[in-house]
């Protein structure tokens, strides 16, 4: 019995059929079920094992160093389609099973995505490029810079749209960073998946198809494309600075905050319905792109909670941090016991910015005395900027301006991160 055999395993009260997988535990047999999920079975509880020939089977082979090479893609350009570059950074959308551990790890290059989703070739001329291969929780500011540099290079080489595959956990941080760092006339679309490609419930293919569709549109700016509903119906196009992951596992985890999505994308009919005004591109400047790579990394993001110790702020100040973003309660408040830490930061020229942990809504520190006193201590209320976006924005500002100018610019709407008014519906 070898890895890759299709087997029927009888236990005392049940039976399992599936593909035999490698196991790192000598006492356990691992089987990949038809559902796409793995099950581990203790050998001592197995009554019998029978090798079967699966329906429509081909000889299964796990990826190894000797068989994971593919022949180069031979793609002919269609002059009627736009040229789209897919840049892979890793994550669930670009993952497959690790047959050593049974876990899912990043493994696909961008070209592998084309092989997995051949429908892309009916939408655009695709160029694939892997720039990173990381889980998104390992994303670093220096990787934002690498991504921005890759975007610039692709646009200068003729890309008319960019798709970036990215893990979902920190995708909204990267979307915000690229929004501030990259100035371009082409759409830059980030896309991820909540369920990996080996699972029947995977959202990867529909999300990628929808992302490439969006990348062919005559719009500019940075966006996120993900499932718009739990079912495989539509995907939503979100502004990169007004979107957040709001569920740990649902396929429609990403939502626009304080506004509607920019558009709904139907990957089946290939229709895009815009829900509000877009940022039209200037096609005569399609190859013009500039990036600003300067970021101040000594920025902290702190969630306010009952009993929070002001020593936390003093710690960051003493460690040389340049700015601190607070996720305040409600309209932008902190406990009074936190005031001494804020005062300490202000006296040491450390900028303290206020967002709200409610996510939806706007900071307003003029209503209650707590907010007014915080302002007197130097805290700047930052409208309806999402805390993660505010964190990235001040990194960008302090990387390019002194403290005085950064204070003036923090509440200036630069790339759509501030809504002048909020529809009560959202």
From Swiss-Prot:
Coiled coil: none
InterPro entries hit by this protein: AsnA_fam, Asp/glu_Ase-like_sf, Asparaginase/glutaminase-like, Asparaginase/glutaminase_AS1, Asparaginase/glutaminase_AS2, Asparaginase_C, GatD, GatD_N
Keyword Transit peptide (UniProt): no
GO annotation terms (biological process): amino acid metabolic process; regulation of translational fidelity; translation
GO molecular function, one term: ATP binding
SMART domains associated with the record: Asparaginase
EC nos: 6.3.5.-
Catalyzed reactions: L-glutamyl-tRNA(Gln) + L-glutamine + ATP + H2O = L-glutaminyl-tRNA(Gln) + L-glutamate + ADP + phosphate + H(+)
Protein keywords: ATP-binding, Ligase, Nucleotide-binding, Protein biosynthesis
Domain Asparaginase/glutaminase: 82-413
Active site: 92, 168, 169, 245
SUPFAM superfamilies in UniProt: GatD N-terminal domain-like, Glutaminase/Asparaginase
NCBIfam families: asnASE_I, gatD_arch, PRK04183.1
Role according to the record: Allows the formation of correctly charged Gln-tRNA(Gln) through the transamidation of misacylated Glu-tRNA(Gln) in organisms which lack glutaminyl-tRNA synthetase. The reaction takes place in the presence of glutamine and ATP through an activated gamma-phospho-Glu-tRNA(Gln). The GatDE system is specific for glutamate and does not act on aspartate.
Quaternary structure (record): Heterodimer of GatD and GatE.
Family: Belongs to the asparaginase 1 family. GatD subfamily.
Protein name as annotated: Glutamyl-tRNA(Gln) amidotransferase subunit D
